[in-house]
Amino acid sequence: MKGSYKSRWVIVIVVVIAAIAAFWFWQGRNDSQSAAPGATKQAQQSPAGGRRGMRSGPLAPVQAATAVEQAVPRYLTGLGTITAANTVTVRSRVDGQLMALHFQEGQQVKAGDLLAEIDPSQFKVALAQAQGQLAKDKATLTNARRDLARYQQLAKTNLVSRQELDAQQALVSETEGTIKADEASVASAQLQLDWSRITAPVDGRVGLKQVDVGNQISSGDTTGIVVITQTHPIDLLFTLPESDIATVVQAQKAGKPLVVEAWDRTNSKKLSEGTLLSLDNQIDATTGTIKVKARFNNQDDALFPNQFVNARMLVDTEQNAVVIPTAALQMGNEGHFVWVLNSENKVSKHLVTPGIQDSQKVVIRAGISAGDRVVTDGIDRLTEGAKVEVVEAQSATTPEEKATSREYAKKGARS
């Protein structure tokens, strides 16, 4: 009894499910039949509409630029540090008390300008003593020469011996030697007095004072009084790979000074322009680089000692080069390529050979010609032969606007 009861319930459930399925089937069929006349009419009005609808849609928006022919400079770049043309630590040559400083920290000075004074009292005394001794010995010499003249007259009549005459002659010579020594002592004392006035040995900018007025200083002090850095002119020391040495040497042989530009740390602003001064005489075996020195007039004080800069040295200019924006150059499995637009705004891939390149533009040595249009933005979804819409680049866009534009380009390409 229990088995037949369960069988009946199973049959009932199956029948209910079948009835529901049949209802939904007939309902869907009626809906499709009612919609068919409209669809047929639309198909009659546009026989190829379905096929075109599968292929049509918004064209992918791209930005393009025209390849131009121009002269392109070739630069060698390196990282460098500004160094003073000369750095001098001003020290005292004599010992004594510092009486005065005659400079302002940071000011520009000329060679010979008075910087400091040491108490000259002791040097004046020493000079006076030397001058007094010189005067005394000169008087002695005068008297000795008079005696010699008398001895010479008396010797003619044999009133004095030859020995006495020779002794007087020796005394005169000895006194003459003493005079020379006295003159040297006077010169030395005068020099010591002169050194009590400390002057600038070179043109340049003085730094911070190293000692205050009133202190006792000596010629052995290593810190000195002040440091002068010569910044007019000023030098730039940077490095280049050893592979660039031949290029630099060849450019030097052309006979023209090589222009070197100093750019700021971010490489966005040119600070100054100078010329190549020299190459080092050996390569650093550890880094495989060579040191290069350039000199700048720096009259505007744009460069400062120990400042970090980016160096760019012009070594050549390539004439009649085909140039495109760097953004147009792409890299694929087959090598470098660009997307070229024809007169119908259809794109095709062209393999190219790039040359000189920077962040803004690149020289194309082979693959395209001047006048060809290349895609610079919206490249992501391009396919061979696809037709695109060329839009103008906005003069100023925010990062959010650029992101929106790229997203729109992707959506258009997908369509």
UniProtKB/Swiss-Prot annotation:
Main localization of the protein described in the UniProt heading: membrane
InterPro entries: CusB_D23, Multidrug-R_MdtA, RND_pump_MFP
Listed Gene3D superfamilies: 2.40.30.170, 2.40.420.20, 2.40.50.100, Helix hairpin bin
Keyword Ligase in record: no
Cellular-component GO terms for this entry: efflux pump complex; plasma membrane
Organism annotation: Escherichia coli O157:H7
Name the UniProt record assigns to this protein: Multidrug resistance protein MdtA
Induction: The mdtABC operon is transcriptionally activated by BaeR.
